[in-house]
Amino acid sequence: MNDIIRIGTRKSALALIQTQLVADELRQVCPGIQVEIVTKDTLGDRILDKPLQEFGGKGVFVSEFEQAIQEGVIDLAVHSAKDLPMELAEGLTIAAVSGREDPRDVLVTMRGHKIRPESVVRIGTSSPRRQLQAGLMCKTLWPGAAGTECSTLRGNVHTRLRKLEEGNFDCIILAAAGLKRLGLLEQDTYEYTFLNPEEFIPAGGQGLMAVEAKAGTMAHSLTQAMDHAHGRLCLELERRVLKLLDAGCHEPIGIYSVPDNGQLEVWGISSRRGEVKRIHMTGGTSREDMEKLALEAWKGLM
């Protein structure tokens, strides 16, 4: 096969690693295919001094790649699934979903750093979901602390770690999947506290990669061979719940699911109108059962 598949991705080290994983798998399922990686900075990469919810939400990492697919500049785009907006651009589809890397959030501190009794813990995170749960778990995570203070933290993983090193925060919260893919968990500069995803609930799609394509194209057809059934199952349920909730990145909502013996187990958290709600439920994996489960989750989180 002499076809060239052009894959679009952001320029960050993590985005490039994730895209290389997709490119390598595509070469395995389509021997002889040529792959070209096309990089660009998105609006979300260029504006780092504001929370995402102030200038466009999740779509700021995706929309420029969607336009490039529609215009034929690239054939595929690789995204962290949690960055996908609820509505894809016209004619585009999620052609493949990866298997799930570690879905947990991680508290990262400088090695040896201690929280003083009765002090306020300075946390670097722009995520309302992480801010909510860090506050709720303050006494568990930092016994003796007076409370938490969360401040905006944007940029790629290395930028965020540098700001931690500069003393701007007592800790920052990052996704385990990104730290693992970047090989940063081997560094002894930091201490890592992995948070149980059944208690500190991840974002919908966290730990998953999604490959976007124009529906009906050769690239779409080829990429479908890479689709991971369990990853697809979880992403579809989690995105369905988020869509029912009409949730954007400005709302503190976590949703996480795990396939187990033909069932889907799901955990969720939300805070609306000042009331925190949690769910934990199980349902089947047929289309009908998944819709029923999503509706039950929605009702529990509203």
Task: Label the predicted regions.
Residues 44-49, 77, 85-88:
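Short active-site-adjacent helix-start/loop capping segments
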Residues 49-76:
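Short, structured active-site "lid" loops
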Residues 74-78, 170-171:
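Short, Asp-centered acidic motifs that coordinate Mg2+ and/or phosphate
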Residues 81-84, 177-179:
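Short glycine-rich anion-binding loops that position phosphate/pyrophosphate groups of nucleotides
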Residues 81-82, 88-147:
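A conserved helix-loop-strand patch within extracytoplasmic ligand-binding domains
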Residues 2-41, 46-47, 54, 62, ...:
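Small-molecule-sensing regulatory modules
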